[in-house]
Amino acid sequence: VSVPRILLALALACTLGAGVAPAPAQRAAAELQRVRSRPELLHDFLLRMPKGGDLHHHLTGAVYAESYIGYAIEDGDCIDASTFAIVAPPCDGKATLPATQAASNFVLRNHVIDALSIRNFHPSPLDEDVRLHFFAAFDAFDRVTNGHWAEMLAEVVHRAAAQNEIYLETMLTPDQGEVIRLAAGVPWTNDLGALRATLLAAGMAKAVADGSRNLDVAEAGMRQRFACGTRAADVGCGLTLRYQYQVLRAFPRVSVFAQMLAGFEMARADRRVVAINLVQSQDEYNALADFPLHMRMLDYLHRIYPDVHITLHAGELTPGEVKPEELWANHIEQSIDVGHAERVGHGLDIVYERNAPAVLAMMARKHILVEDCLYSHEVVRDMRGRDNVLPIYLRNHVPISLATDDEGVTRSDLTDSFERAVLGYSADYPTLKTFARNSIRYAFVDAQTKRALEARLDADFARFEASF
């Protein structure tokens, strides 16, 4: 029997023995203990439970494959008959099939869904690793992502709000690649000040303004779909939505710096963009080779834009993926000390950092939140039970929030992550409640918005606990 369960039982016994009804939070905790072995009751409990927010969320990875098939049909695109990826027309009917066939051909539809996600993944000679299949899925649906932001936002915001989330930070590229195209004609120089000046003069302001307009259009389309302001308003109208500017770290260094600069500029100009983040697989060649340079870039830009928040994918590496020296390279520590990360996503290789106890102590002291993506860690990285880092961070008092990462590709949601915490790591009700509170406490919003979100979360918990 776990220590939290013993303490809970003693607390309830003392309370009842004194003739006093247990407090609402105690009743909710007791209910979780009662239903943890009853899947149908546990899921209902966790679905209704307030979860705060999702701080690690990739927009394109959060949309389900069925939606991407719909976009491909709407756009007149094709399906590659061998890879089942969405490709450009014309469709020849043999090597490439009209996407409309995925609406009527059940077998084809299921092949496409499996290609655009990790559903039904089984290793094969041409597709032998779930992690590689996971990243390949993004290429398979990439063609239809930029033209459907309103629908995509509507899908993920509704899903979050329907699970009793009140806040979402999602990662995207607001300028839709305009900055990457701009940087293609700019030569690299180690003089970051000169490079910044060149990029600003090359049209960065236009790209940033275009990014804000893209968000305007997408949000207006989302609100229209939600019928916000009417009696038929969708539950998603009440969710607070913010964005992280994602930087593709596997690109050439001039492109990476240009994206970083655009992210800092946009966060300064548009309050909806609250942070920048580096994305793409961390074992990509440029991501590994240029990691120290990327941190220096962030350090340089942080000094110019000190009020812009930074959260970084860090330590998303596991033994066997890379040489041991890369695991020992203290990517997590460097992301915090040099890259100025206030939050860390994943943090899987913490035990391999040199002097890991000191790094963990530093994270606890500085209140560096770890965005723990339980589902992707377990299913994509095969890190379960003792191999998972969640207990390590909890044991060392590092703040944690649970996040979905790419719920569309992994076919999951935030409720699933909370359920995994309960079933796989014996998380009790106070721990789950702390996860939810941390997601608001460490959210990158202004003080007034944070106070409002915290008050709303308190009220949501009061209503939830009063139901038991």
PLM region spans:
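Positively charged n-region of N-terminal signal peptides that target proteins for export
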Residues: 1-5
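Bacterial N-terminal signal peptides
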Residues: 7-17
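Metal-cofactor-binding active-site regions of metalloenzymes
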Residues: 23-468
